[in-house]
Protein backbone atom coordinates (compact mmCIF):
# COMPACT_ATOMS: atom_id res chain seq x y z
CA UNK A 1 0.00 0.00 0.00
CA UNK A 2 2.83 2.38 0.90
CA UNK A 3 4.48 1.60 -2.43
CA UNK A 4 1.28 2.50 -4.32
CA UNK A 5 1.01 5.79 -2.42
CA UNK A 6 4.68 6.53 -3.16
CA UNK A 7 4.22 5.88 -6.90
CA UNK A 8 1.07 8.02 -6.89
CA UNK A 9 2.90 10.94 -5.28
CA UNK A 10 5.71 10.78 -7.86
CA UNK A 11 3.30 10.63 -10.81
CA UNK A 12 2.63 13.93 -12.64
CA UNK A 13 -0.82 15.50 -12.50
CA UNK A 14 -1.76 14.80 -16.14
CA UNK A 15 -1.23 11.06 -15.71
CA UNK A 16 -3.23 11.11 -12.50
CA UNK A 17 -6.06 12.88 -14.33
CA UNK A 18 -5.88 10.26 -17.09
CA UNK A 19 -6.32 7.51 -14.51
CA UNK A 20 -9.24 9.46 -13.04
CA UNK A 21 -10.90 9.67 -16.46
CA UNK A 22 -10.56 5.93 -17.09
CA UNK A 23 -11.89 5.05 -13.64
CA UNK A 24 -14.79 7.48 -14.08
CA UNK A 25 -15.82 5.89 -17.39
CA UNK A 26 -15.52 2.33 -16.08
CA UNK A 27 -17.41 3.04 -12.86
CA UNK A 28 -20.10 4.98 -14.78
CA UNK A 29 -20.70 1.98 -17.04
CA UNK A 30 -20.31 -0.78 -14.45
CA UNK A 31 -21.81 0.78 -11.31
CA UNK A 32 -23.93 3.82 -12.30
CA UNK A 33 -26.05 3.56 -9.14
CA UNK A 34 -23.15 4.32 -6.79
CA UNK A 35 -23.96 8.02 -7.02
CA UNK A 36 -21.69 8.94 -4.12
CA UNK A 37 -18.80 8.87 -6.62
CA UNK A 38 -20.30 11.90 -8.38
CA UNK A 39 -19.94 13.81 -5.12
CA UNK A 40 -16.17 13.97 -5.66
CA UNK A 41 -16.78 15.96 -8.85
CA UNK A 42 -19.24 18.33 -7.23
CA UNK A 43 -16.88 18.97 -4.32
CA UNK A 44 -13.92 19.58 -6.64
CA UNK A 45 -15.73 22.09 -8.86
CA UNK A 46 -17.28 23.72 -5.80
CA UNK A 47 -13.87 24.13 -4.18
CA UNK A 48 -12.37 25.68 -7.32
CA UNK A 49 -15.27 28.08 -7.74
CA UNK A 50 -15.08 29.00 -4.06
CA UNK A 51 -11.38 29.83 -4.01
CA UNK A 52 -11.09 31.43 -7.48
CA UNK A 53 -12.69 34.83 -6.60
CA UNK A 54 -10.44 35.19 -3.54
CA UNK A 55 -7.42 34.24 -5.63
CA UNK A 56 -8.25 36.84 -8.26
CA UNK A 57 -8.89 39.58 -5.69
CA UNK A 58 -5.65 39.05 -3.78
CA UNK A 59 -3.37 38.46 -6.78
CA UNK A 60 -4.64 41.44 -8.77
CA UNK A 61 -4.62 43.76 -5.75
CA UNK A 62 -1.11 42.61 -4.83
CA UNK A 63 0.19 42.96 -8.40
CA UNK A 64 -1.14 46.51 -8.74
CA UNK A 65 0.06 47.51 -5.27
CA UNK A 66 3.62 46.47 -6.14
CA UNK A 67 3.73 47.84 -9.68
CA UNK A 68 5.37 51.26 -9.90
CA UNK A 69 3.59 53.96 -11.87
CA UNK A 70 4.34 53.85 -15.56
CA UNK A 71 5.38 50.16 -15.57
CA UNK A 72 5.04 48.56 -19.00
CA UNK A 73 2.33 45.96 -19.34
CA UNK A 74 1.30 43.48 -22.04
CA UNK A 75 -2.39 43.83 -21.26
CA UNK A 76 -3.19 45.86 -24.38
CA UNK A 77 -1.76 43.09 -26.57
CA UNK A 78 -3.56 40.40 -24.57
CA UNK A 79 -6.93 42.15 -24.83
CA UNK A 80 -6.52 42.68 -28.59
CA UNK A 81 -5.70 38.98 -29.00
CA UNK A 82 -8.73 38.01 -26.92
CA UNK A 83 -11.12 40.14 -28.97
CA UNK A 84 -9.68 39.23 -32.37
CA UNK A 85 -9.50 35.52 -31.50
CA UNK A 86 -13.15 35.46 -30.42
CA UNK A 87 -14.28 37.25 -33.59
CA UNK A 88 -12.19 34.92 -35.79
CA UNK A 89 -13.77 31.89 -34.11
CA UNK A 90 -17.26 33.32 -34.62
CA UNK A 91 -16.57 33.93 -38.31
CA UNK A 92 -15.16 30.41 -38.74
CA UNK A 93 -18.38 29.03 -37.22
CA UNK A 94 -20.49 30.92 -39.77
CA UNK A 95 -18.29 29.63 -42.60
CA UNK A 96 -18.58 26.06 -41.32
CA UNK A 97 -22.37 26.41 -41.16
CA UNK A 98 -22.40 27.54 -44.81
CA UNK A 99 -20.27 24.56 -45.87
CA UNK A 100 -22.20 22.02 -43.77
CA UNK A 101 -25.76 23.33 -43.30
CA UNK A 102 -27.68 21.53 -40.57
CA UNK A 103 -31.41 21.61 -39.90
CA UNK A 104 -33.00 21.11 -36.50
CA UNK A 105 -36.23 19.38 -35.52
CA UNK A 106 -38.08 22.09 -33.59
CA UNK A 107 -41.19 21.26 -31.56
CA UNK A 108 -43.66 23.37 -29.62
CA UNK A 109 -42.12 22.50 -26.26
CA UNK A 110 -38.96 23.85 -24.72
CA UNK A 111 -36.46 22.16 -22.45
CA UNK A 112 -35.73 25.15 -20.28
CA UNK A 113 -37.64 28.05 -18.78
CA UNK A 114 -34.57 30.23 -18.13
CA UNK A 115 -35.08 33.76 -19.43
CA UNK A 116 -32.22 34.85 -21.73
CA UNK A 117 -31.09 38.44 -22.35
CA UNK A 118 -33.53 40.28 -24.62
CA UNK A 119 -30.86 42.00 -26.69
CA UNK A 120 -27.24 42.97 -26.99
CA UNK A 121 -27.97 46.20 -25.10
CA UNK A 122 -29.13 44.16 -22.11
CA UNK A 123 -25.91 42.14 -22.19
CA UNK A 124 -23.87 45.37 -22.05
CA UNK A 125 -26.09 46.75 -19.31
CA UNK A 126 -25.58 43.62 -17.22
CA UNK A 127 -21.81 43.85 -17.67
CA UNK A 128 -21.77 47.51 -16.60
CA UNK A 129 -23.89 46.73 -13.53
CA UNK A 130 -21.42 43.99 -12.61
CA UNK A 131 -18.65 46.60 -12.52
CA UNK A 132 -20.33 48.50 -9.66
CA UNK A 133 -21.47 45.42 -7.75
CA UNK A 134 -20.90 45.31 -4.00
CA UNK A 135 -17.40 43.81 -3.54
CA UNK A 136 -18.60 41.27 -0.96
CA UNK A 137 -21.47 40.23 -3.22
CA UNK A 138 -19.07 40.06 -6.18
CA UNK A 139 -16.91 37.58 -4.25
CA UNK A 140 -19.90 35.56 -3.06
CA UNK A 141 -21.48 35.29 -6.53
CA UNK A 142 -18.20 34.92 -8.47
CA UNK A 143 -18.86 38.12 -10.41
CA UNK A 144 -15.38 38.40 -11.94
CA UNK A 145 -16.00 41.77 -13.58
CA UNK A 146 -16.84 43.17 -10.14
CA UNK A 147 -13.98 41.32 -8.46
CA UNK A 148 -11.50 42.62 -11.04
CA UNK A 149 -12.80 46.17 -10.70
CA UNK A 150 -12.54 46.24 -6.91
CA UNK A 151 -9.20 44.42 -6.96
CA UNK A 152 -7.86 47.13 -9.27
CA UNK A 153 -9.24 49.88 -7.03
CA UNK A 154 -7.82 48.30 -3.87
CA UNK A 155 -4.51 47.56 -5.58
CA UNK A 156 -4.07 51.17 -6.68
CA UNK A 157 -4.97 52.34 -3.16
CA UNK A 158 -2.47 49.90 -1.62
CA UNK A 159 0.33 51.58 -3.60
CA UNK A 160 0.22 54.33 -0.99
CA UNK A 161 0.11 51.93 1.98
CA UNK A 162 3.03 51.13 4.28
CA UNK A 163 5.49 48.32 3.54
CA UNK A 164 4.03 46.28 6.41
CA UNK A 165 0.56 46.46 4.87
CA UNK A 166 1.90 45.49 1.45
CA UNK A 167 3.75 42.54 3.00
CA UNK A 168 0.50 41.40 4.62
CA UNK A 169 -1.25 41.56 1.25
CA UNK A 170 1.57 39.53 -0.32
CA UNK A 171 1.39 36.91 2.43
CA UNK A 172 -2.37 36.64 1.97
CA UNK A 173 -1.92 36.09 -1.78
CA UNK A 174 0.71 33.40 -1.11
CA UNK A 175 -1.52 31.60 1.41
CA UNK A 176 -4.47 31.52 -0.99
CA UNK A 177 -2.19 30.31 -3.81
CA UNK A 178 -1.03 27.49 -1.53
CA UNK A 179 -4.63 26.46 -0.85
CA UNK A 180 -5.27 26.49 -4.61
CA UNK A 181 -2.34 24.11 -5.06
CA UNK A 182 -3.89 21.70 -2.56
CA UNK A 183 -7.24 21.80 -4.37
CA UNK A 184 -5.65 21.20 -7.78
CA UNK A 185 -3.83 18.23 -6.28
CA UNK A 186 -7.26 16.62 -5.80
CA UNK A 187 -8.15 17.05 -9.50
CA UNK A 188 -7.86 13.31 -10.39
CA UNK A 189 -10.54 12.41 -7.84
CA UNK A 190 -12.74 15.35 -8.81
CA UNK A 191 -12.52 14.59 -12.52
CA UNK A 192 -13.24 10.91 -11.83
CA UNK A 193 -16.48 12.05 -10.17
CA UNK A 194 -17.38 14.39 -13.02
CA UNK A 195 -16.80 11.72 -15.68
CA UNK A 196 -18.75 9.15 -13.65
CA UNK A 197 -21.70 11.53 -13.31
CA UNK A 198 -21.80 12.21 -17.07
CA UNK A 199 -21.58 8.54 -18.08
CA UNK A 200 -23.98 7.31 -15.37
CA UNK A 201 -26.68 9.85 -16.26
CA UNK A 202 -26.34 10.00 -20.05
CA UNK A 203 -24.70 6.75 -21.07
CA UNK A 204 -23.01 6.52 -24.45
CA UNK A 205 -26.17 7.10 -26.53
CA UNK A 206 -27.33 10.49 -25.22
CA UNK A 207 -25.94 12.37 -28.21
CA UNK A 208 -26.87 9.90 -30.97
CA UNK A 209 -29.71 11.91 -32.53
CA UNK A 210 -27.66 15.10 -32.62
CA UNK A 211 -24.43 13.61 -33.92
CA UNK A 212 -24.08 15.87 -36.97
CA UNK A 213 -24.70 19.05 -35.01
CA UNK A 214 -22.25 17.95 -32.34
CA UNK A 215 -19.69 17.02 -34.99
CA UNK A 216 -19.94 20.49 -36.54
CA UNK A 217 -19.64 22.19 -33.15
CA UNK A 218 -16.67 20.14 -31.97
CA UNK A 219 -15.02 20.16 -35.40
CA UNK A 220 -15.16 23.96 -35.55
CA UNK A 221 -13.68 24.22 -32.06
CA UNK A 222 -10.87 21.82 -32.95
CA UNK A 223 -10.16 23.81 -36.14
CA UNK A 224 -9.91 27.03 -34.14
CA UNK A 225 -7.71 25.39 -31.49
CA UNK A 226 -5.32 23.73 -33.95
CA UNK A 227 -5.35 26.09 -36.95
CA UNK A 228 -6.73 29.57 -36.21
CA UNK A 229 -5.17 30.11 -32.78
CA UNK A 230 -1.73 28.81 -33.84
CA UNK A 231 -1.87 31.08 -36.91
CA UNK A 232 -2.61 34.11 -34.71
CA UNK A 233 0.17 33.07 -32.32
CA UNK A 234 2.64 32.65 -35.19
CA UNK A 235 1.85 36.08 -36.64
CA UNK A 236 2.50 37.68 -33.23
CA UNK A 237 5.48 35.61 -32.00
CA UNK A 238 7.10 34.86 -35.38
CA UNK A 239 7.99 31.32 -34.25
CA UNK A 240 6.51 27.81 -34.22
CA UNK A 241 3.47 28.06 -31.90
CA UNK A 242 2.51 24.39 -31.72
CA UNK A 243 4.62 23.32 -28.70
CA UNK A 244 2.95 26.10 -26.71
CA UNK A 245 -0.50 25.35 -28.17
CA UNK A 246 -0.28 21.66 -27.22
CA UNK A 247 1.01 22.49 -23.73
CA UNK A 248 -1.95 24.83 -23.14
CA UNK A 249 -4.42 22.23 -24.42
CA UNK A 250 -2.78 19.44 -22.40
CA UNK A 251 -2.77 21.24 -19.07
CA UNK A 252 -5.50 23.88 -19.21
CA UNK A 253 -7.77 22.34 -21.84
CA UNK A 254 -7.99 18.89 -20.27
CA UNK A 255 -8.94 20.24 -16.83
CA UNK A 256 -11.44 22.75 -18.25
CA UNK A 257 -13.00 19.99 -20.36
CA UNK A 258 -14.18 18.28 -17.19
CA UNK A 259 -14.94 21.28 -14.97
CA UNK A 260 -16.88 22.85 -17.89
CA UNK A 261 -16.14 26.33 -16.56
CA UNK A 262 -13.49 28.92 -17.44
CA UNK A 263 -13.96 30.50 -14.02
CA UNK A 264 -13.34 27.25 -12.16
CA UNK A 265 -10.16 26.76 -14.23
CA UNK A 266 -8.62 30.14 -13.32
CA UNK A 267 -6.32 28.66 -10.62
CA UNK A 268 -5.06 26.00 -13.05
CA UNK A 269 -4.32 28.63 -15.70
CA UNK A 270 -2.49 30.88 -13.26
CA UNK A 271 -0.22 28.04 -12.20
CA UNK A 272 0.50 27.19 -15.84
CA UNK A 273 1.34 30.82 -16.65
CA UNK A 274 3.70 30.91 -13.68
CA UNK A 275 5.45 27.75 -14.90
CA UNK A 276 5.77 29.20 -18.42
CA UNK A 277 7.52 32.28 -17.07
CA UNK A 278 4.79 34.88 -17.55
CA UNK A 279 5.03 38.06 -15.48
CA UNK A 280 2.63 37.73 -12.50
CA UNK A 281 1.55 41.34 -13.06
CA UNK A 282 0.23 40.23 -16.45
CA UNK A 283 -1.34 36.85 -15.80
CA UNK A 284 -2.96 37.82 -12.50
CA UNK A 285 -5.13 40.20 -14.54
CA UNK A 286 -5.24 38.58 -17.99
CA UNK A 287 -6.39 35.12 -16.86
CA UNK A 288 -9.50 36.20 -14.90
CA UNK A 289 -10.19 38.79 -17.60
CA UNK A 290 -9.92 36.07 -20.24
CA UNK A 291 -12.42 33.95 -18.32
CA UNK A 292 -14.84 36.84 -18.87
CA UNK A 293 -14.20 38.18 -22.38
CA UNK A 294 -12.17 35.53 -24.23
CA UNK A 295 -15.01 33.31 -25.38
CA UNK A 296 -14.11 31.73 -28.73
CA UNK A 297 -15.95 28.51 -27.87
CA UNK A 298 -19.06 30.39 -26.79
CA UNK A 299 -19.05 32.42 -30.02
CA UNK A 300 -18.84 29.19 -32.04
CA UNK A 301 -21.75 27.66 -30.14
CA UNK A 302 -23.92 30.76 -30.54
CA UNK A 303 -23.25 31.06 -34.28
CA UNK A 304 -23.59 27.40 -35.26
CA UNK A 305 -26.87 26.90 -33.39
CA UNK A 306 -28.22 30.21 -34.70
CA UNK A 307 -27.26 29.29 -38.27
CA UNK A 308 -28.88 25.86 -37.78
CA UNK A 309 -32.11 27.65 -36.83
CA UNK A 310 -31.74 29.93 -39.86
CA UNK A 311 -31.31 26.94 -42.20
CA UNK A 312 -34.26 25.16 -40.58
CA UNK A 313 -36.55 28.15 -41.19
CA UNK A 314 -35.22 28.75 -44.71
CA UNK A 315 -33.95 32.26 -43.98
CA UNK A 316 -31.40 33.67 -46.43
CA UNK A 317 -28.22 35.08 -44.89
CA UNK A 318 -25.92 37.32 -46.93
CA UNK A 319 -22.28 38.14 -46.16
CA UNK A 320 -23.01 41.38 -44.32
CA UNK A 321 -25.56 39.62 -42.09
CA UNK A 322 -23.04 36.86 -41.38
CA UNK A 323 -20.44 39.48 -40.49
CA UNK A 324 -22.88 41.24 -38.17
CA UNK A 325 -23.79 37.90 -36.59
CA UNK A 326 -20.09 37.27 -35.89
CA UNK A 327 -19.71 40.67 -34.23
CA UNK A 328 -22.85 40.22 -32.12
CA UNK A 329 -21.85 36.68 -31.13
CA UNK A 330 -18.37 37.87 -30.15
CA UNK A 331 -19.72 40.66 -27.97
CA UNK A 332 -22.56 38.59 -26.52
CA UNK A 333 -20.24 35.72 -25.64
CA UNK A 334 -18.83 37.78 -22.77
CA UNK A 335 -22.18 37.26 -21.07
CA UNK A 336 -21.45 33.53 -20.89
CA UNK A 337 -18.38 34.01 -18.70
CA UNK A 338 -17.62 31.38 -16.10
CA UNK A 339 -20.98 29.61 -16.38
CA UNK A 340 -21.36 26.00 -17.52
CA UNK A 341 -23.77 26.14 -20.47
CA UNK A 342 -23.97 29.93 -20.33
CA UNK A 343 -23.38 30.42 -24.07
CA UNK A 344 -26.66 28.67 -24.88
CA UNK A 345 -28.62 31.44 -23.18
CA UNK A 346 -27.15 34.00 -25.59
CA UNK A 347 -28.50 32.21 -28.67
CA UNK A 348 -31.81 34.17 -28.66
CA UNK A 349 -29.80 37.40 -28.90
CA UNK A 350 -28.24 36.21 -32.16
CA UNK A 351 -31.52 34.72 -33.41
CA UNK A 352 -33.20 38.10 -32.97
CA UNK A 353 -31.00 39.47 -35.79
CA UNK A 354 -32.96 37.33 -38.24
CA UNK A 355 -36.40 37.94 -36.78
CA UNK A 356 -36.63 34.48 -35.22
CA UNK A 357 -39.26 34.58 -32.43
CA UNK A 358 -38.08 34.05 -28.88
CA UNK A 359 -40.24 30.92 -28.57
CA UNK A 360 -38.41 29.24 -31.45
CA UNK A 361 -35.06 30.57 -30.26
CA UNK A 362 -35.63 28.93 -26.89
CA UNK A 363 -36.29 25.63 -28.66
CA UNK A 364 -32.86 26.00 -30.23
CA UNK A 365 -31.50 26.55 -26.72
CA UNK A 366 -33.22 23.30 -25.74
CA UNK A 367 -31.41 21.48 -28.55
CA UNK A 368 -28.20 23.00 -27.24
CA UNK A 369 -28.82 21.53 -23.81
CA UNK A 370 -29.20 18.07 -25.35
CA UNK A 371 -25.74 18.21 -26.96
CA UNK A 372 -24.37 20.25 -24.07
CA UNK A 373 -22.82 17.21 -22.38
CA UNK A 374 -19.87 17.38 -24.79
CA UNK A 375 -20.36 20.81 -26.41
CA UNK A 376 -20.02 22.66 -23.11
CA UNK A 377 -16.90 20.69 -22.18
CA UNK A 378 -15.20 21.36 -25.54
CA UNK A 379 -16.23 25.00 -25.36
CA UNK A 380 -14.70 25.44 -21.90
CA UNK A 381 -11.52 23.64 -22.99
CA UNK A 382 -11.10 25.99 -25.97
CA UNK A 383 -11.92 29.12 -23.99
CA UNK A 384 -9.67 28.32 -21.05
CA UNK A 385 -6.66 27.06 -23.02
CA UNK A 386 -6.83 30.16 -25.23
CA UNK A 387 -6.64 32.38 -22.13
CA UNK A 388 -3.22 30.95 -21.35
CA UNK A 389 -2.12 30.78 -24.98
CA UNK A 390 -2.73 34.45 -25.76
CA UNK A 391 -1.30 35.57 -22.41
CA UNK A 392 1.96 33.71 -23.09
CA UNK A 393 2.02 34.84 -26.74
CA UNK A 394 1.76 38.49 -25.66
CA UNK A 395 4.52 37.97 -23.08
CA UNK A 396 6.92 36.27 -25.50
CA UNK A 397 6.20 38.86 -28.15
CA UNK A 398 7.24 41.54 -25.64
CA UNK A 399 10.47 39.66 -24.89
CA UNK A 400 11.55 40.13 -28.53
CA UNK A 401 11.01 43.89 -28.46
Curated annotation (Swiss-Prot):
<dbReference type="GO" id="GO:0032329">
    <property type="term" value="P:serine transport"/>
</dbReference>
<dbReference type="GO" id="GO:0005295">
    <property type="term" value="F:neutral L-amino acid:sodium symporter activity"/>
</dbReference>
<keyword id="KW-0029">Amino-acid transport</keyword>
<dbReference type="InterPro" id="IPR023025">
    <property type="entry name" value="Ser_Thr_transp_SstT"/>
</dbReference>
<dbReference type="InterPro" id="IPR036458">
    <property type="entry name" value="Na:dicarbo_symporter_sf"/>
</dbReference>
<dbReference type="Pfam" id="PF00375">
    <property type="entry name" value="SDF"/>
</dbReference>
<feature type="transmembrane region" description="Helical">
    <location>
        <begin position="179"/>
        <end position="199"/>
    </location>
</feature>
<feature type="transmembrane region" description="Helical">
    <location>
        <begin position="40"/>
        <end position="60"/>
    </location>
</feature>
<keyword id="KW-0812">Transmembrane</keyword>
<feature type="transmembrane region" description="Helical">
    <location>
        <begin position="336"/>
        <end position="356"/>
    </location>
</feature>
<keyword id="KW-0769">Symport</keyword>
<comment type="similarity">
    <text>Belongs to the dicarboxylate/amino acid:cation symporter (DAACS) (TC 2.A.23) family.</text>
</comment>
<comment type="function">
    <text>Involved in the import of serine and threonine into the cell, with the concomitant import of sodium (symport system).</text>
</comment>
<dbReference type="GO" id="GO:0015826">
    <property type="term" value="P:threonine transport"/>
</dbReference>
<feature type="transmembrane region" description="Helical">
    <location>
        <begin position="17"/>
        <end position="37"/>
    </location>
</feature>
<feature type="transmembrane region" description="Helical">
    <location>
        <begin position="78"/>
        <end position="98"/>
    </location>
</feature>
<feature type="transmembrane region" description="Helical">
    <location>
        <begin position="295"/>
        <end position="315"/>
    </location>
</feature>
<keyword id="KW-1133">Transmembrane helix</keyword>
<feature type="transmembrane region" description="Helical">
    <location>
        <begin position="138"/>
        <end position="158"/>
    </location>
</feature>
<keyword id="KW-0813">Transport</keyword>
<feature type="transmembrane region" description="Helical">
    <location>
        <begin position="212"/>
        <end position="232"/>
    </location>
</feature>
<keyword id="KW-0472">Membrane</keyword>
<protein>
    <recommendedName>
        <fullName>Serine/threonine transporter SstT</fullName>
    </recommendedName>
</protein>
<keyword id="KW-1003">Cell membrane</keyword>
<dbReference type="InterPro" id="IPR001991">
    <property type="entry name" value="Na-dicarboxylate_symporter"/>
</dbReference>
<dbReference type="GO" id="GO:0005886">
    <property type="term" value="C:plasma membrane"/>
</dbReference>
Amino acid sequence: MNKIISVWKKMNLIRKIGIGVVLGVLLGLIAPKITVIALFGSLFVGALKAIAPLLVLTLVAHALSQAPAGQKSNMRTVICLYLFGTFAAAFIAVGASYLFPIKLVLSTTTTTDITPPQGIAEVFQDLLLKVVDNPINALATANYIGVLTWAAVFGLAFRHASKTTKDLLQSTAEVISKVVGWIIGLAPFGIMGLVFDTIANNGLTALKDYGLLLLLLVGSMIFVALVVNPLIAFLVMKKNPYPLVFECLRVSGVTAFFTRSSAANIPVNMQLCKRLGVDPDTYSVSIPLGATINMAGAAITINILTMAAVHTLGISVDFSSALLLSVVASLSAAGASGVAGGSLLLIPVACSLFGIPNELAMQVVGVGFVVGVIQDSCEAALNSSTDVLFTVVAERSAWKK
